[in-house]
Each structure stands twice: as C-alpha cells, then as structure tokens.
Swiss-Prot record:
Belongs to the endonuclease V family. It comes from the Bacteria. The record marks Y80 as: Interaction with target DNA. This is Endonuclease V.
Length: 226
C-alpha cells in the first residue's frame, strides 16, 4: 500500500490543532464482519536508539503472513508529549505498512482509539489518515473511567466512560485473572463492534495473538540494535 504523506507539525500547539480537526472526521460506525486480513501494529523505543515500528499482516484463518519493520531515527521523532503519541509513532507505522506485500482490510493498533482526551488516539489517527477501519487495544488506561468493577473471569467487559458520561469503549478481561485491556474503536467501527472484533481474535495470553506477535517482533528488532 502507498500511504498518503503524513503531516509533521512544527510544534505541539500545531499538533493539538491538527488533532482536534482530525477528531471531527472520526466515524464510530461500521462492521468488521467478513474482515479477514488485518495489520497488527506495535512500536518500541529506547533512549538513544531509533523507534522501531512493526506491521504484522495477519490472516484470521491462517495466522501471521508477513512482518514489516521500519526504523525512525531518534532525531527525526516528534517530541514526546502526553496525548500526542501518534505524531511520534505514525510516520514509522506508515513506513512499515507500505512495506507489506498487500494492504490490510483493517488495523489493530497497540494504543488508544477514541479513548483519548481529544478523541484521537493512535488507532483513530491512523484510521482517519488511511481511511481504514481501526481498533485500539491499550494496556494502560489513558482517559475515562470504568462504568463498574470488572469481573475477574475471561471475556468480562464493562463500558469505559468519558468524564461527561459518553461511552468511549470497553475495559476488557482477555484472560481470567490477568490485567484488563482497554478497547476502543479507532475509525469506521462502532463501539460494540470493536469489542466484538477483539473477542473474535485468538488470545492465548493477555494480548490478542496478532498484537502479541507484533509486540514480540518489535522487541526483537529493538534488541538487535544494541
């Protein structure tokens, strides 16, 4: 695939303005029924090293098909600013996606979708930029609060609510007794559909298998730079 050029803001204030504008383009409607090939995205970075981004092409029936890795030099990275992570990681993700042998039908991203202070986490940002359905699966809570306590058993889910009560996604227990995940739609996916899709994915550990494999690849690639 050939992603369109990604704008690089000159400073955080410009990034904030762009983020607010792009958030208005997010569509929280759509189905992932019938989607078969997705790209799972994960990134890893250590001070003094390039940022490593991995795009793993995954067939929901056959498993992993292809892994593409991109390195972005540290000096080329957008400054680290909480809530603006997508401007730091997205250029490397787009480079990795461009190296895949075929375009995915949807994106599964390690990070937030609309569960973000301005409604545009990395999954939403990439989804809008590429006009692809996208789902964010985060390991940590960035924004919002659980509607109720989350049961310990596998498959349990409670809604994640914004401070004003709007639903943002779900707090989801992928395995009994493990820490929860925070699932939110990115773009062209409804809230319930995002959770439904993540529940469909094979999950042997805490992370859905496509994201777990992408995470392992990113870690290996970063370690190889030492």
């Amino acid at each position: 695939m050939r992603p369109p050029p990604f704008p690089k803001p000159a400073h955080p204030e410009e990034a904030l303005a762009l983020q607010r504008a792009l958030a208005k383009k997010v569509r929280l409607a759509g189905s992932l029924e019938g989607v078969r090939r997705i790209a799972a995205l994960d990134a890893s970075h250590k001070r003094g090293r390039p940022l490593v981004a991995v795009a793993l092409l995954y067939d929901l029936e056959k498993g992993p098909l292809h892994v593409a890795t991109a390195l972005l030099p540290e000096e080329a990275l957008f400054p680290y600013v909480p809530g603006l992570l997508s401007f730091r990681e997205a250029p490397a993700y787009l480079e990795a996606l461009a190296a895949l042998p075929e375009a995915p039908e949807a994106l599964l991203v390690d990070g937030q979708g609309v569960a973000h202070p301005r409604g545009l986490g990395i999954a939403s940002h990439l989804g809008v930029h590429l006009d692809l359905p996208s789902v964010g699966v985060a390991k940590r809570l960035l924004y919002g609060r659980p509607e109720a306590p989350l049961p310990e058993e596998k498959g349990a889910a409670v809604r994640l609510l914004a401070p004003d009560g709007r639903p943002l996604g779900y707090v989801y227990r992928s395995r009994t007794g493990v820490k929860p995940l925070y699932v939110s739609p990115g773009h062209r996916v409804g809230l319930e559909e995002a959770l439904r899709f993540v529940r469909r994915l094979p999950t042997r550990f805490r992370l859905p298998e496509p994201l777990r494999l992408a995470h392992l690849e990113a870690g290996r690639a970063l370690k190889a730079l030492d």
